[in-house]
């Protein structure tokens, strides 16, 4: 399968299954578009009719171009065969290990964001803080079910996890003890709205957390429309100085500013640029997840605006990078020179199998977006996964699980997409959230274009960087530990 598009002055041709990316002139671009359905003579005639007035386009040149396209096809760089379908289901049929937990240490929050999918941190239930005993058992559950995998991921989540900070500190200390006993390496992430950040929190996170996610929606007027406290007061002025101090002290350790855009700020690139101008360089901005009847929900009329915004973002990122003011956007982070192995590219995020959410009471759900839905209760941290039917349903979420995905050029980049988004949009985790698909494909086009621009600049300096699909390391297939 081949996908062609034009963006920022580049004619880009992507071969889906090999991962090869070709940057060509307009003549070759048109030749490739005609190649599958037309003879060489038909292509030559059409190209001469379109470009015949140009002295650099002759029949000899066109036939050489067609020969070059044929050579690329024969060498698996264009219209390469799809050999991954069987691998997708074989991979999911293996014995799984649990590698990550989203630990809901607080079903309570000190903000009252109106668009919150978690019902202001309560997940449509009671307010609660996780006890140390439950947290400890959750870590034991993770260790017991992680097999030979060494690196284990734990995200302290809520609600607002810093409302249970003392328990978090105690639990991390426990995990550090268990690392030595079981030859494991815990990597912690803290996701916070920032209200309770102080020097103690900063020092702890910079010592113990592999990553931190800091919630900010961008411009003050945008952030304070939704991210308010229980009295309706905006949070921007309270949290931005804390975030700036946090990031300053964090040095070169991982962090992300994580925002949400809605129908009310479809010009969300201005919020990203605002955060960059505040000094933040690791940025993410997500489309809102809410009921379609909610006034903040994105509409069909918003879609072309959002696509244009992603293009504006990509072009500005290239510009700022050249000026020495570059920043990272999470959804444009792709590695075309190697990247994830094929098993990771055809399987989904691992929700419900390798990744689960744990409530303050110890219940297990496929991920944080399913918490509170009795249909998707997997079990608990004492008895393990008892609802094997749900686990098996999630096992078969992959890039080939949906008929619509099998013919999509982006399937090896999205791995089948988000099961929760599909469920909330269609009522089934194997449904297709078409709106999200459109946004994802535009993000991938922009991300690839940025890589093309980077490679063009390197090529101008005499540095060649091949672009190809991630290889198969076999670690996942063999059940071995990997990153």
Region roles according to the model:
Residues 56-203, 207-208:
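Conserved alpha-helical substructure of the radical SAM core
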Residues 135, 139-155, 164-288:
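Radical SAM/AdoMet-radical enzyme domain recognition
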Residues 305-338, 368-415:
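C-terminal accessory region of radical SAM enzymes
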Residues 38-51:
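Short acidic, hydrophobic short linear motifs in intrinsically disordered regions
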Residues 63, 221-237, 244, 248-352, ...:
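Radical SAM enzyme [4Fe-4S]-AdoMet core and its adjacent flexible, acidic
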Residues 139-157, 394-396, 432-476:
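Short Fe-S-cluster ligation motifs
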Residues 1-35:
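Acidic, low-complexity/disordered tracts enriched in E/D and polar residues
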Residues 108-118, 366-369, 403-420, 474-481:
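Local cysteine-cluster metal-coordination motifs and their immediate loop/turn environment
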